[in-house]
Amino acid sequence: MTNFLLASLPIATILFLMIKANWGAARAGAAAWFVTVILAVFFFGAPTDMLIIAQAKGVMLALYILYIVWAALILYFAAEEAGAIKTIGRAIRSLTDDRPLQLLILGYVFASFLQGVAGFGVPIAVVAPLLLGMGFSPVLAVAAPMIGHSWSVLFGNMATSFEALIGVTGIPGTELTHYSAILLGLSGFMCGAAVLWLDGGFRTIRRRIVPLVLISGVMGVVQYFMANYGVWTLGGLTAGIAGLVASIIVTRFWKPHPDDVAEQVADDHQHMPLIEALTPYLVFIVLVTMATFVPAVEMLLGKIRFTLDFPETATANGWVIEAESAKAIAIFGHPGALLLYTAAISFTFFKLRGHYDDGIGKRIWQRTLKSGLPTSIGMVPVIGLAIIMDHAGMTYALAEGGAAVFSGAFAIAYPVIAPAIGALGA
C-alpha cells in the first residue's frame, strides 16, 4: 500500500496545482514530472539510463501526436481564414427554425464534426460564437459544444487520443476499437441528450427524441464501422459528416413545436458555396482513403520512417522493461503529413478562388503558433511522466493497489470508478 500511495503522488501533484494553485497544464505537468523522477529514483529504484530511455520514448510519442496537432491546426486556420467554417456554420443554422434542434445540430453534431477535424478546443471556439450570434445565452453557447463534442474525442482529430492510448499501452488498436466504439456510440446519445437538456430540460429531450435517436445513431454506427475496419483516424471526422447529412435529412421532415420557433437573426451574405467550404475535408477523406486502401500509395508514403531502438533496462527492485523500438513516424505517410498535403491543396484552392487577403500565410502561421505552442509545451512532460511511471513500476503499483482496494465485495464498484480514472488521466 505504501508503493500505491507513493505512485499516486504525481497525479495528486497535478490535481493540487491545477485545482488549488490555479496553475496551467504545462506548468503543473512539469512540476509533476519532477516529482515523478524523484519518486522513481529514490523509492522505485529507477537508474538514470531508465529515466533517459523513458523520456526519449515520451518525446518520440509526443512527436508522433504533435505532427498531427500542428498539421490539423494549419488546415483548420487555412479553412477558417477563407470563410469555410463560417459558411458551414451558416448552412447548419439555416436548416431549421426549431431552436432546440438548431442547438443540437450546432452544439452536438457540428461540434463533433469539428472535433474530428481539429480538436484541441476548436469546437468550442467555433461553435460558441455562432450560438451567441443566434441569440443563445453565453453560458449555453459555451456549455453546449463543450458537452456535445466530448464523445468524439477518442477518434476525433485524426484519433490522436487513440494513437496515444495504443502507444502508451502497447495494445494493438484492433483489440480496442470494438468496445470503445460501442461505448462511445452510447456516450454520443447521452451527449446529444445533455445538449437538449440545457435548453429546456427533459421536456425538450422528449420532444426531440426522434431526431436525437436518428442523428446520434447514424454517427455512432459510422464511427463504429470506420474504427473497426482499421480507419480509426477518420472515425470522428466521418461520424461528424454523417451526422451533418443525417441532420439535413431529418430537418426536411421535422416540424418545430410552436413554442420553440427560433427568432430570425440577421446574417451577412454568404459568399462561398457550401460544397466549396467542404472542399478541404473532402480532399482529406480522399487522401486518407488512398493512403489506407491503395497498397502502392501506402507503400510509397511509408518508405521513409523515423524511429529509435531502445535497450532493455531494469530497476533495482527487479522491474524489467524489455528492449523495444519507439512508435515509428512515416515522414510522408503519417496522418500529419496527409493533413499537410490537404492544407497545401486547400490553401492553393482558396487562394485561386480569391478568398484570402494579403499576408494570409503569416496570419495562418501566427494563429497556429498561438494555438499549438501551449499544447506542445504541456504534452511533452506529461507523456514523459506517464512513461517514466510505467517503466519504474509505478503504474503497476497503482494497478496493484487499486486491485487490492476494489477486491471482494468492492469489485463491482470498479467499473463505476474507472471512467473517473480515465478522465483524470486526460
Regions found by a protein language model. Give the residues of each.
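Membrane-core helix-loop-helix motifs of multi-pass transport proteins
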Residues: M134, M146-R252, M272-I275
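Hydrophobic mid-bilayer segments of alpha-helices in multi-pass membrane transport proteins
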Residues: L6-L15, W23-F44, L66-A72, L212-S216, ...
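Transmembrane helical segments that form the transport core of multi-pass membrane transport proteins
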Residues: A262-A418, G425
